[in-house]
């Protein structure tokens, strides 16, 4: 349903009523370091307007920005454990072995080390932690 409601206000689906995701922010102890990690992993440049407390990647055309905010008392999430994850990123890749090697080179830590990315049996995803401990997946 789109358009207006009976009282004339914007209805669901109306562009003026839409709420859109603009930025995903990861808390971390070092925004510069985490921005460099994701810049290298995603191939997006770091926005030059950041500072010591806030860094972000330049847009990728999706309209969603990935940003990194200093949190002095950041505690990395633990995975896996009994508590549910608060958030993780699913990053789409074409070649799992190449993406795995790049993630490791940049400082990612595999969280499912029993999986072999070069195996003949294709895996649909691999789970990692970024340098600040946030979980993310590389997904086919």
For the regions a language model picked out, list residue spans one by one:
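Surface-exposed beta-strand edges and their flanking turn/coil or helix-capping segments
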Residues: 6, 39-41, 79-83, 102-104, ...
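N-terminal presequences and immediately downstream first alpha-helices
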Residues: 25, 36-57
């Amino acid at each position: 349903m789109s358009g207006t409601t009976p009282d004339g206000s914007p209805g669901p689906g109306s562009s003026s009523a839409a709420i859109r995701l603009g930025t995903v922010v990861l808390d971390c102890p070092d925004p510069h370091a985490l921005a460099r990690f994701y810049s290298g992993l995603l191939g997006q440049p770091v926005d030059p307007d950041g500072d010591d407390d806030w860094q972000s990647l330049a847009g990728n055309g999706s309209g969603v920005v990935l940003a990194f905010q200093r949190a002095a008392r950041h505690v990395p999430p633990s995975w896996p454990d009994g508590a549910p994850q608060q958030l993780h990123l699913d990053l789409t890749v074409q070649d799992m072995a190449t993406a795995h090697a790049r993630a490791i080179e940049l400082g990612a830590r595999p969280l499912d080390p029993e999986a072999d990315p070069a195996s003949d049996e294709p895996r649909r995803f691999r789970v990692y932690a970024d340098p600040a401990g946030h979980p993310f997946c590389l997904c086919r």
